Amino acid sequence: MSLLTEVETYVLSIVPSGPLKAEIAQRLEDVFAGKNTDLEALMEWLKTRPILSPLTKGILGFVFTLTVPSERGLQRRRFVQNALNGNGDPNNMDRAVKLYRKLKREITFHGAKEVALSYSAGALASCMGLIYNRMGAVTTEVAFGLVCATCEQIADSQHRSHRQMVATTNPLIRHENRMVLASTTAKAMEQMAGSSEQAAEAMEVASQARQMVQAMRAIGTHPSSSAGLKDDLLENLQAYQKRMGVQMQRFK
């Protein structure tokens, strides 16, 4: 796996699923391929994206700044600086300075990542802030190691939280989660179907599913009534893909 592929993997792991994630993935690919060289426009686009947390925007802004060539005097962006200040906690800043000194001695991506993984996400973000604000300088490889370690820490906590939700025995939470997943799947089906004539059937199925979820929410249904909703939708989607001559593994 190349270095940039690894960076893209880690960064995308902390972006919530949805159309915006696909858009961000495309921007990262373009940036890493050298196709997008307007850092100013890229940062303006990032700043106005909805849904993303300030920290995720800060990390993406840091990655874009590291990768896109820019004029020396280009102004640092406030939204990135604010996100990478470790919540203003002096302890985070102290640890960030210690980590920075260690990173100065590293020359490889993996070496930097290993060193950084023993620090908290707050300290890692503060250390990125030091580098972003030009208070410290490390090689791009080392900076990417720091980025990936930060994303791993964040993804770990997100995964723990997600696992807790999936494993919950509370039937109301499970019911709502199944309806949300069914609704999201229906939305994805509508986007994939596009405008071809054969797509009408898939669009109809997706539309009915979304109406059904809305009705279930409006009238309040038994928690078990949502069981299998998403799987039924995916089966319909696969049947549609087969007719279109597309063979894809089931993506559950």
From Swiss-Prot:
- Where is the short sequence motif Nuclear localization signal located? 101-105
**Name of the protein this chain belongs to:** Matrix protein 1
What would be an example GO MF term here? Answer: RNA binding
Q: Quote a single Gene Ontology cellular component term.
A: virion membrane
* Function of the protein: Plays critical roles in virus replication, from virus entry and uncoating to assembly and budding of the virus particle. M1 binding to ribonucleocapsids (RNPs) in nucleus seems to inhibit viral transcription. Interaction of viral NEP with M1-RNP is thought to promote nuclear export of the complex, which is targeted to the virion assembly site at the apical plasma membrane in polarized epithelial cells. Interactions with NA and HA may bring M1, a non-raft-associated protein, into lipid rafts. Forms a continuous shell on the inner side of the lipid bilayer in virion, where it binds the RNP.
Which keywords does this Swiss-Prot/TrEMBL entry list? Host nucleus, Membrane, RNA-binding, Viral matrix protein, Virion
Q: Where in the cell is it found?
A: Virion membrane; Host nucleus
Q: Which domain of life is it from?
A: Viruses
Instruction: List the InterPro entries.
Output: Flu_matrix_M1, Flu_matrix_M1_C, Flu_matrix_M1_N, Flu_matrix_M1_N_sub1, Flu_matrix_M1_N_sub2, INFV_M1
